[in-house]
Amino acid sequence: MIDSIVGIIQEVFSNYVILNYNNLYIKIFCNSTKFSEFLGKEKRVYVSLKFNENLSELECYGFLTREERELFLKLQKVTGVGSKLALQILSSIDFQELIVEIAKGNVAKLEKVKGIGKKTASRIILELKETLKKEFKVASTSGKEEKTYEKLEEISLALLSLGYDIDEVNQVLSSEDFSELSLEDGIKLALKKLSKI
């Protein structure tokens, strides 16, 4: 498996660059805005190789840091995301900001990315929130907020396990204040609200 490639950024296009590696020209899908700063310069690019949807071509995705690549790999594993959309997310939101917003459960921020709806944004947060908080040591603004986030996540998981739609669950959780309620009371309130949707 190839970890990284060192070469000259030969050309920059809207969503990929051409890397000159010993006169072998490699097409690398990437955040071209960041890579444009290194046009004509030698750069180490951390890569991820993957076959396209019809398995006819091996695509190369490139990043300036290992951390960005790791987040890309996590994003593409989320149901409904895939490689192209994962790259679109990383190209639309700054790396550090993206980690913080996912850890905070900010669905609205992710919805602003082209190609992402509320359902996909909610799924990204549901699947990656705790992982990113642990791996990147994202600090909450307060202990109280941290407990509220954890409580909302537990309520969300409980409701999803009962078969409720993720969009309806998020609608209810964002419309009420659950901070002062116990987990049991929070679930009861959410169920009451869901019955009216």
Swiss-Prot record:
Cellular compartments per GO CC: cytoplasm; Holliday junction helicase complex; Holliday junction resolvase complex
Region of interest (Domain I), residue spans: 1-64
Biological process according to GO: DNA recombination; DNA repair
Keyword set includes Signal: no
Residue segments, region Domain II: 65-143
Region (Domain III): 152-197
MF annotations from Gene Ontology: ATP binding; four-way junction DNA binding; four-way junction helicase activity
Localization, UniProt: Cytoplasm
Domain of life of the organism encoding this protein: Bacteria
Primary location class: cytoplasm
Keyword annotations from UniProtKB, A to Z: Cytoplasm, DNA damage, DNA recombination, DNA repair, DNA-binding
InterPro entries the record matches: DNA_helicase_Holl-junc_RuvA_I, Hlx-hairpin-Hlx_DNA-bd_motif, NA-bd_OB-fold, RuvA, RuvA_2-like, RuvA_C, RuvA_C_sf
Region (Flexible linker): 144-152
NCBIfam families: ruvA (TIGR00084)
Function: The RuvA-RuvB-RuvC complex processes Holliday junction (HJ) DNA during genetic recombination and DNA repair, while the RuvA-RuvB complex plays an important role in the rescue of blocked DNA replication forks via replication fork reversal (RFR). RuvA specifically binds to HJ cruciform DNA, conferring on it an open structure. The RuvB hexamer acts as an ATP-dependent pump, pulling dsDNA into and through the RuvAB complex. HJ branch migration allows RuvC to scan DNA until it finds its consensus sequence, where it cleaves and resolves the cruciform DNA.
Family of this protein: Belongs to the RuvA family.
Quaternary data: Homotetramer. Forms an RuvA(8)-RuvB(12)-Holliday junction (HJ) complex. HJ DNA is sandwiched between 2 RuvA tetramers; dsDNA enters through RuvA and exits via RuvB. An RuvB hexamer assembles on each DNA strand where it exits the tetramer. Each RuvB hexamer is contacted by two RuvA subunits (via domain III) on 2 adjacent RuvB subunits; this complex drives branch migration. In the full resolvosome a probable DNA-RuvA(4)-RuvB(12)-RuvC(2) complex forms which resolves the HJ.
HAMAP family named in the record: DNA_HJ_migration_RuvA
Domain remark from Swiss-Prot or TrEMBL: Has three domains with a flexible linker between the domains II and III and assumes an 'L' shape. Domain III is highly mobile and contacts RuvB.
Protein name: Holliday junction branch migration complex subunit RuvA
